[in-house]
């Protein structure tokens, strides 16, 4: 028996989950927020308890020290050496990493170089990796890449219709993201349907603050909505999703607050989507509250959101030439029944129908009617468990 930590590190946060392996039992979980800012928050959940402390945490190394000390302080572990592995979620692996790998200096260097593909994610992941290597240098450290699952896409799918020199010289192509989540829920869908994954055509919809949809053919990703970066695809919480690229130079010319392309991309990443259109929030719960109040901006944001998701799902029916099931997962996918109802309501032509008694908050499983030709499933994603499993698998390959 051993203990493994799954880590999802951002620029100012560190989310973690501690497992007893190979039993896959969750021993504790938590998050450290506002790293590098005043009044950082460290939250630990274990044995039905929740402990929270506010303190100043200056960097990721300090955050990891506090996390490990908390595990000892709360009696979750007796000593550091009980932890034998750590797995790190890394958003962008580019073409270099087609599967999870054990960390070494070269791997870490590549992750930092690939930050251009995920500027909001990879730098934080690299900081988390460095912190654990500094404090626990002897344990197995593994990187699990969001992009790995999508390396099965065909060249005609991942290339953009621009001169090929931009791919050969600069590696401009579709990479996708959320691959760990899409892979996991596809496997769970096969179990739920009682059929081999290798026989199924699935559309998996990861709908959280970030949104990505994937066409899964016989267990492999054949297309996905996120692209060169996680900015592409349907509308998201704070991200615009797909827009006409000519808008970028136009806005630079017209708006004095947007001085260059970086300013526009920052706006598209952090100030757009549900939040930007509604002027209220990136949280679907707040948007739905706005619907109840007949707030016109909330209504508009919601309608754009539903429209973009329906269009993306619809195109993947064409990519797969039909599908056996549609899977909803992640924060909104799992917990927003109104959103699911309105998405499916625009896709009934494909033979989908949901049971309103099952399409309720908190329900997991098959929410379609017996007559539905395409099954509609709600499955909780578990990226942390996937990460812990890969650590366990790779422990003896250092």
From Swiss-Prot:
It is an enzyme of class 2 (transferase). ATP binds at residues 15, 206-210, 283-285, 331-335. Mg(2+). Can also accept Mn(2+). GO terms for cellular component: cytoplasm. Its EC number is 2.7.2.1. The record marks 178, 239 as: Transition state stabilizer. Mg(2+) binds at residues 8, 383. InterPro entries: Ac/propionate_kinase, Aliphatic_acid_kin_short-chain, Aliphatic_acid_kinase_CS, ATPase_NBD. PROSITE patterns: ACETATE_KINASE_1, ACETATE_KINASE_2. Catalyzes the formation of acetyl phosphate from acetate and ATP. Can also catalyze the reverse reaction. Belongs to the acetokinase family. This is Acetate kinase. It comes from Streptococcus pyogenes serotype M2 (strain MGAS10270). The gene is ackA.
């Amino acid at each position: 028996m051993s203990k493994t930590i799954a880590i999802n590190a951002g620029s100012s946060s560190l989310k973690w989950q501690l497992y007893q392996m190979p039993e896959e039992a969750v021993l504790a979980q938590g998050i450290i927020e506002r790293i590098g800012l005043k009044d950082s928050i460290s939250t630990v959940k274990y044995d039905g308890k929740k402990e929270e402390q506010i303190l100043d945490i200056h960097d990721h190394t300090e955050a990891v020290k506090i996390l490990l000390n908390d595990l000892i302080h709360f009696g979750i572990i007796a000593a550091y050496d009980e932890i034998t592995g750590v797995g790190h979620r890394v958003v962008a692996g580019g073409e270099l990493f087609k599967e999870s790998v054990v960390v070494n200096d070269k791997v870490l260097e590549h992750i930092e170089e690939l930050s251009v593909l995920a500027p909001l994610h990879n730098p934080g992941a690299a900081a988390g990796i460095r912190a654990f290597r500094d404090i626990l240098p002897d344990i197995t450290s593994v990187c699990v890449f969001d992009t790995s699952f999508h390396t099965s896409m065909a060249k005609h799918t991942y290339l953009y219709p621009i001169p090929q020199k931009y791919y050969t010289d600069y590696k401009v192509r579709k990479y996708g993201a959320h691959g760990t989540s899409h892979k996991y829920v596809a496997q769970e869908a096969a179990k739920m349907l009682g059929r081999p994954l290798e026989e199924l055509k699935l559309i998996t919809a990861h709908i959280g603050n970030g949104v990505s949809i994937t066409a899964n053919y016989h267990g492999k990703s054949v297309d996905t909505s996120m692209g060169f970066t996680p900015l592409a695809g349907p509308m998201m919480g704070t991200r615009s999703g797909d827009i006409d690229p000519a808008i970028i130079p136009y806005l630079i010319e017209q708006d004095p607050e947007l001085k260059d392309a970086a300013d526009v991309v920052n706006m598209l990443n952090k100030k757009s989507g549900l939040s930007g259109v509604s002027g209220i929030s990136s949280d679907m719960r707040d948007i739905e509250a706005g619907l109840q109040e007949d707030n016109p901006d909330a209504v508009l944001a919601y309608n754009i959101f539903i429209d973009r998701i329906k269009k993306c799902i619809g195109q993947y029916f064409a990519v797969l030439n039909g599908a056996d099931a549609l899977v909803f997962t992640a924060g909104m996918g799992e917990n927003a029944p109104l959103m699911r109802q309105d998405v499916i309501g625009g896709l009934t032509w494909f033979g989908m129908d949901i049971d309103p008694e099952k399409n309720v908050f908190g329900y997991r499983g098959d929410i379609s009617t017996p007559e539905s030709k395409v099954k509609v499933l709600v499955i909780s994603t578990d990226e942390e468990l996937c990460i812990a499993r890969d650590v366990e698998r790779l422990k003896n390959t250092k």
